[in-house]
Amino acid sequence: MALLDLAQEGMALFGFVLFVVLWLMHFMSIIYTRLHLNKKATDKQPYSKLPGVSLLKPLKGVDPNLINNLETFFELDYPKYEVLLCVQDHDDPAIDVCKKLLGKYPNVDARLFIGGKKVGINPKINNLMPAYEVAKYDLIWICDSGIRVIPDTLTDMVNQMTEKVGLVHGLPYVADRQGFAATLEQVYFGTSHPRSYISANVTGFKCVTGMSCLMRKDVLDQAGGLIAFAQYIAEDYFMAKAIADRGWRFSMSTQVAMQNSGSYSISQFQSRMIRWTKLRINMLPATIICEPISECFVASLIIGWAAHHVFRWDIMVFFMCHCLAWFIFDYIQLRGVQGGTLCFSKLDYAVAWFIRESMTIYIFLSALWDPTISWRTGRYRLRCGGTAEEILDV
């Protein structure tokens, strides 16, 4: 009986610690968003003396927004940069889009690379290798095909690349688009994701996504170049780790990495979340414990039980009040990341928020159930530590 009492006391203490940690994350991310995001960065050096940048753009297939997204990179207001467009397959329709833009912007230093170079199991690395090998500038900007930018995006990122910084990354967010699936994505990338992403970076944990990353090429070369990361599916995590292990700091751009894919749906979003969770579980096994208890409904139940055990408060009343507070703070976070008026109503937000939170346990259990992922054109079996092997159809 004494052992049971001790276990309950321990669980109650855990609940209160969880409460403090999660609400610190809320406050840190909201304050950081208000102070840092969507602010014009201070110019660290004269415009004419900004260093050259090689943009590596991996492309696969075409969606309705691809040409408009790509065109924003040809219209950057930056003195010295090159655009290296990378397409793996010779019959990919993205090639025609690239050729159209190359013809429209002859004064932009841009080239098209077709065919890639097989150096490992990561298709993105394979696609980028020929461009990486001929990149002529000291700064490498790897940016996904679904990202769109504004003219001063690159200037902002380079201004963050100060003397001791080795990597500049953008907080992933989603552009305003039509439909409930777009709202669902926007709610996730404006609430749950930045809360974890920002608080991790503020407290010194290296949390980086590869959607938009500016890196020092010489530091990557010291780590073995891109080829050293071809054995991983989550190459962005291991590239960031290699840079951090060499003593370099990270900085976050004041502009978000604006995702603007023209192809989106609830099922695509769900599949993406499951894939990301699988990768996190294999790279960081502690995710198995930390991730479920950091979500609203599970956390509210644990903390509610702790409050009931210690103060005899009604669990369900506490659960509802805690979820309501979480819901409100998430809305504040979302408005901060958006940096302006949302394109959907508060009712749309409420529905999308509830559905997203309700999906979390299913997503987590689905990720645990099957260790394989489908990405781009292949299927892969994940191994502990982040490596993977390709599953070949016989």
UniProtKB/Swiss-Prot annotation:
Active site annotation, chain numbering: D236
Endpoints of the signal sequence: none
Classification via Pfam families: Glyco_transf_21
This protein's record includes keyword Acetylation: yes
Gene Ontology terms, MF aspect: ceramide glucosyltransferase activity
Ranges spanned by the short sequence motif D1, renumbered to the chain: 92
Site positions (May play an important role in binding to the inhibitors DEPC and PDMP): H193
Gene Ontology terms: biological process: cell differentiation; cornified envelope assembly; establishment of skin barrier; glucosylceramide biosynthetic process; intestinal lipid absorption; keratinocyte differentiation; leptin-mediated signaling pathway; neuron development
EC number(s) on file: 2.4.1.80
Motif D3: positions: 236
Domain of life assignment: Eukaryota
Annotated membrane topology: Multi-pass membrane protein
Residues with N6-acetyllysine modification: K117
CC annotations in GO: Golgi membrane
Subunit and interaction comment: Interacts with RTN1; regulates the ceramide glucosyltransferase activity of UGCG.
Family: Belongs to the glycosyltransferase 2 family.
Primary role: Participates in the initial step of the glucosylceramide-based glycosphingolipid/GSL synthetic pathway at the cytosolic surface of the Golgi. Catalyzes the transfer of glucose from UDP-glucose to ceramide to produce glucosylceramide/GlcCer (such as beta-D-glucosyl-(1<->1')-N-acylsphing-4-enine). Glucosylceramide is the core component of glycosphingolipids/GSLs, amphipathic molecules consisting of a ceramide lipid moiety embedded in the outer leaflet of the membrane, linked to one of hundreds of different externally oriented oligosaccharide structures.
UniProt domain comment: The D1, D2, D3, (Q/R)XXRW motif is a critical part of the GCS active site, involved in catalysis and UDP-sugar binding.
Protein name in UniProt: Ceramide glucosyltransferase
Organism annotation: Mus musculus
